[in-house]
Each structure stands twice: as structure tokens, then as C-alpha cells.
């Protein structure tokens, strides 16, 4: 808690309320969660109240370390109430590790309400090691409100990832830009669902760009719904293997074909390299904190370790 930011533990359900006063500028909130016990299933409800005219950065994420045989799961439900002319940058990162047979599951839900003139930019990244994820995002925008979503996902092995975006452009001159970048390696499978509804004079754009490697599988299911004559909605999608000319360029610089493919995959999904030392919960703690150390300004942290 600071002079402008209050973090209050909920009394009726697990989670916290983050209350940011109107006019707050250049401050940040960090909310990392670490699960280190095999078989632990955790659900939290975190609500963010962003006052009128505030300009803040919120950093959240979860790391799971599972060396056992049971499934470890974290489901985080984050709801944002963004006031008039407020600006929020939300950064969310997920990471999993552990040599046990137990699965690592992360199911984030993000609900966003943006009032007149409000702005939110979301950067969501699934780094590695997550066996299964269903990522749901729902948003409604008032007059002049803007939502920008940048999703980055990498799956490998037999992992599965499903992302679902639903955006209601209710206000005059509201706008949304939903961009997904992903890499599917091994036998992994991904599904990208996007639904933008233009209910007023507005602009909506959704884009899926996926790289396939090995026997990866990606399915993109766009949906645009125009309910107003002045709604302008656009969808773009590109799914395929790495282009041969891209490989050749890197191989002429001395990389092997495998090294070139790996480099392109990292660039395509903007993969975060984690090189923390140590083991067990120490390693995953360092990893997720390192991955989340991207914001600037005065900050307040709520840290939750489940062990």
C-alpha cells in the first residue's frame, strides 16, 4: 500500500482488491503468484479499481513448479474497472517447470470495463512449461475508450492452449486491437477464438500470426459482428511454417538449420529467455520475478507463494 494505492484482502472470497486513487501517475503494482506444491489447486479473484485520470502499470503473473505426480493448477480471475480518461498498462506472464509427471495448468480470466476516454494495453505472455491453458478475456468499452491486446504464446510437447477474446465496442469512437503471436512446436495444439462486436460507430481489428514447427497444430476462429452502420471491423490471420528464405538468411551467418529455426521461433513469439540458477521453488521464483521486472516508477507488490 502507498499513498495512492490500497491493496485490501477480500473477506468473502480468496483474492484482493487493488484501489488506485484518481489522478495517480507513474506508479505500479506487482502481483506475482508462485505454486510449488504438487496437487495444489488455487483460485483467486482480484479486482482492480482505477480512478479517473490515473496512469499506472500493473504487473501480474504465475509460476508453477511441479516435481510430483499430481496436477497443480492456478485459476486467476482479474476484473478491471477503468475510470474516465484513465490509462492502464497490464503485463501478465505465465511460466511452468518441474520434472515430475504432474501437469501444470494455468487458466486466467480477464474482465475489463473501460469508461469514457479510458485506455488499456494488455501484454500477456505464456513463456514455457504450461501443459494446459484456457485464457478468457472479455471487455466492454464506452465512448472514446481504447483496448490494445498483445498476446504471445509458445507451446511444445503435447501442450494445449486455447485463447478466447470477446470485445463489445459499445461507445461512440471506441476501438480495439487484438493481436496474437504464437509458436506451436512438437505435438502441441492451439486454438485462437476472437469475437469483436461493433455496437456503435467504432473500429475493431483482430490479428492472428502463428508459426508451425514439427507437428504443431493451430486453429484460428475469427468472428466479427457489426451491429451499427458505422462500425468498421477487420480480421487478419496467417498460419504456417517458417519461410525458407528466413532460414537461409540466418544460416549464411553461421547458424545451423535447427539453430535458425529456434531463433525465428523465439523472435516470432517474443519468447523470454530465463536463465535463473538454483532449483525447485527457488528457481521458479527467480524466473517469474525476473520475467515480471519490466515496469518502471514507484511500485507496490503483493506476493503470494503457495507451498
Enumerate the language-model features and the residues they cover:
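Conserved beta-strand/loop scaffold segments within soluble protein domains that form the structured core
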Residues: 2-257, 266-269
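Short amphipathic alpha-helical segments at helix boundaries and their inter-helical linkers
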Residues: 131, 262-280
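Short, intrinsically disordered, charge-balanced linker/junction segments flanking boundaries
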Residues: 256-259, 263, 301, 305
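Type III/flagellar secretion export determinants
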Residues: 250, 274-307
Amino acid at each position: 500500500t502507498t499513498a495512492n494505492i490500497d491493496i485490501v484482502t477480500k473477506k468473502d472470497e480468496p483474492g484482493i482488491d487493488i484501489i488506485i486513487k484518481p489522478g495517480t501517475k507513474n506508479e505500479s503494482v506487482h502481483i506475482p503468484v508462485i505454486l510449488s506444491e504438487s496437487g495444489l489447486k488455487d483460485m483467486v479473484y482480484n479486482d482492480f479499481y482505477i480512478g479517473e485520470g490515473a496512469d499506472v502499470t500493473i504487473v501480474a503473473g504465475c509460476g508453477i513448479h511441479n516435481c510430483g505426480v499430481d496436477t497443480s493448477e492456478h485459476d486467476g480471475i482479474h476484473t478491471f474497472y477503468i475510470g474516465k480518461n484513465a490509462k492502464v498498462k497490464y503485463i501478465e506472464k505465465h511460466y511452468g517447470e518441474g520434472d515430475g509427471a504432474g501437469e501444470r495448468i494455468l487458466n486466467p480470466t480477464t474482465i475489463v470495463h473501460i469508461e469514457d476516454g479510458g485506455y488499456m494495453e494488455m501484454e500477456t505472455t505464456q513463456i514455457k512449461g504450461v501443459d494446459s491453458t484456457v485464457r478468457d478475456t472479455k471487455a466492454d468499452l464506452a465512448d472514446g475508450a481504447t483496448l490494445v491486446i498483445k498476446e504471445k504464446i509458445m507451446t511444445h510437447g503435447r501442450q494445449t492452449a486455447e485463447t478466447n477474446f470477446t470485445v463489445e465496442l459499445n461507445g461512440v469512437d471506441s476501438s480495439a486491437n487484438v493481436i496474437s503471436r504464437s509458436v506451436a512446436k512438437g505435438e502441441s495444439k492451439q486454438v485462437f477464438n476472437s469475437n469483436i462486436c461493433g455496437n456503435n460507430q467504432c473500429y475493431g481489428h483482430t490479428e492472428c500470426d502463428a508459426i508451425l514447427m514439427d507437428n504443431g497444430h493451430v486453429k484460428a476462429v475469427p468472428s466479427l459482428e457489426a451491429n451499427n452502420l458505422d462500425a468498421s471491423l477487420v480480421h487478419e490471420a496467417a498460419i504456417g511454417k517458417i519461410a525458407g528464405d528466413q532460414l537461409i538468411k540466418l544460416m549464411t551467418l553461421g547458424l545451423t538449420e535447427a539453430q535458425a529455426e529456434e531463433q525465428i521461433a523465439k523472435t516470432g513469439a517474443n519468447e523470454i529467455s530465463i536463465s535463473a540458477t538454483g532449483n525447485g521453488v527457488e528457481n521458479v521464483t527467480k524466473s517469474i520475478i525476473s520475467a515480471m521486472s519490466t515496469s518502471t516508477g514507484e511500485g507496490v507488490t503483493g506476493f503470494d507463494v503457495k507451498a
